[in-house]
Amino acid sequence: MTAEPEVRTLREVVLDQLGTAESRAYKMWLPPLTNPVPLNELIARDRRQPLRFALGIMDEPRRHLQDVWGVDVSGAGGNIGIGGAPQTGKSTLLQTMVMSAAATHSPRNVQFYCIDLGGGGLIYLENLPHVGGVANRSEPDKVNRVVAEMQAVMRQRETTFKEHRVGSIGMYRQLRDDPSQPVASDPYGDVFLIIDGWPGFVGEFPDLEGQVQDLAAQGLAFGVHVIISTPRWTELKSRVRDYLGTKIEFRLGDVNETQIDRITREIPANRPGRAVSMEKHHLMIGVPRFDGVHSADNLVEAITAGVTQIASQHTEQAPPVRVLPERIHLHELDPNPPGPESDYRTRWEIPIGLRETDLTPAHCHMHTNPHLLIFGAAKSGKTTIAHAIARAICARNSPQQVRFMLADYRSGLLDAVPDTHLLGAGAINRNSASLDEAVQALAVNLKKRLPPTDLTTAQLRSRSWWSGFDVVLLVDDWHMIVGAAGGMPPMAPLAPLLPAAADIGLHIIVTCQMSQAYKATMDKFVGAAFGSGAPTMFLSGEKQEFPSSEFKVKRRPPGQAFLVSPDGKEVIQAPYIEPPEEVFAAPPSAG
């Protein structure tokens, strides 16, 4: 039995033949920008070039074209501002940008340092070899260090450009790629500071706003870029906003705030990822995934897989963000102190902490500014710091060069000063009667050192009219001493001598409870030292405990201080020294 031949109508035959034609009818309308394109497809379709990052699809209706869109950060557009209402896709754009750069550049050429005060999405990029660190609002010290590192890179580049006569960042990039050039040793390429959530940044870190402005204004010339996202453009002051040469705008809460064009009102609501470019064209930002899926579903898993994929292709790593240690021992801060054979100036350069700005030691110049004040709440580290600084002074000076007198009512400074470095009589005072007697005797001896009126400048500088050791009066818990004085001003005999302290070899180191510190700066003794510009450490405390228009006291981890000195204001981690071992008496034997 034979099969019957298929019967087809003329219409069916003609339609089949037309469907195989090579030329097709002109499509009047391109498909709407609905679904995001994955990053692997964007990169495959993009025109690759250095410092260009593929970010999405741009619709150009006049050219009847939908093509890959990206940013070129090699020139004036290297700083980027991203504006848009909440949940419009700003953080996803930042993820896409970093992943796009990481997929097309080496960790030697681009590095990212992120401050995430938005939705927390940047933390998923932390394991990229191109990311030197991600800090959030729960890590204020790290936030400060991220900005400080960027400033340090810019300052170092500025010095390098001058030293090696580099005329532009473009020339620097070429020289850095040449292994025979000195600048090839620079571990940083083009570095990007990303701040996701600008209002939160200026609200919680107001002191850093000016530093970010400096980076935005000067950084591009040295390969340092700033990328900022904000829900409202008005949150960005003009002195920052004007330096953001590239702007990307999502749907705004108020279209009148647009920095590009009012066509942003045409962005559909509830369509995350839709934006407008500087060219005034509509965009669909891509998704940071490499699995070919045109969706933002399960994005965390896709990002994690992409990060792992990129990390497996590189052995280099962006320089990590260095942070202040929770504790720095004195022997780490001051491993090789100069000895007694050094000159006076060297011996009285005393290390008092590690700077947050560049992680180098901060010093108290006690040869010219002989005093040090330490204010802080209970358990903030006041006594430990005083102990460590006393040890640093003793390491530099022999007993013939310095002697200590202690006011130590709580016996917190046991073993802080070796017996050889203590004054002979009245060296350790644990009550008011003992202290008053010792201070009066000390004042009598120091008055003999006051300079005669006919000394020359050279004689004043060399202190040739007297000989002997400097005296350090180390006072722990000033507030307790004041309370025990019964209304009498403690240290009154020494107060008139403080203006001449540098001339007569007198140094005072005072610790005080933060709640009493402001009051202490008003008295004739501590107040005289504070008023003369003595370096002052503000450890942990409450803002209202020390009102000031120049800085804000706040809670800090033990040993961390805000240092106010003639050199400026900065955060330091003060030195730590192990407390003396407690010796317990053996229990009496039975019988």
UniProtKB/Swiss-Prot annotation:
**Superkingdom per UniProt:** Bacteria
Q: What are the annotated GO cellular component locations?
A: cytoplasm; peptidoglycan-based cell wall; plasma membrane
Where is it located?
Cytoplasm
Please describe, based on the UniProt annotation, the reported consequence of changing K90T: Cells unable to export EsxB
Main localization is: cytoplasm
Q: What is the additional note? A: In ESX-1 cluster, the FtsK/SpoIIIE-like protein is split in two genes.
Supply the name of the protein.
ESX-1 secretion system protein EccCb1
Instruction: Name the gene behind this protein.
Output: eccCb1
